[in-house]
Amino acid sequence: MKNLTIFSWGYWGWGSCAAQFVKAADAVEASRGYEPLLFVDVRLQRSVRAANFIGGAFKELVGEKRYRWMNKLGNMAVADRSLGKVTIKEPREAESLLDLASECDKENRRVL
């Protein structure tokens, strides 16, 4: 089995500069011989203050074909601080993320 690469990334500090981030990430991927990234959003909720990440704003920025919201991989402790630690909503959903990364690999595309 081939190794898959899935990158993690936090949007903190990129709220008003998301377009520049996407442009830079695409340039890096192209320089390494890859197609543009698929962005997977694992936030439980998308109600934030960061301008380009409120609701579906980031999806609108990158386009529907380059964005997936997988909130089942979100941290329940964001909504319920009494949990006190990271608690993934549906850990088994990680398998869907791996399946998606495998499909992207066939297209010479990586996942962030």
Name every feature range the model reports, one short phrase each.
Residues 1-112:
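Residues lining hydrophobic/aromatic ligand-binding pockets adjacent to catalytic sites
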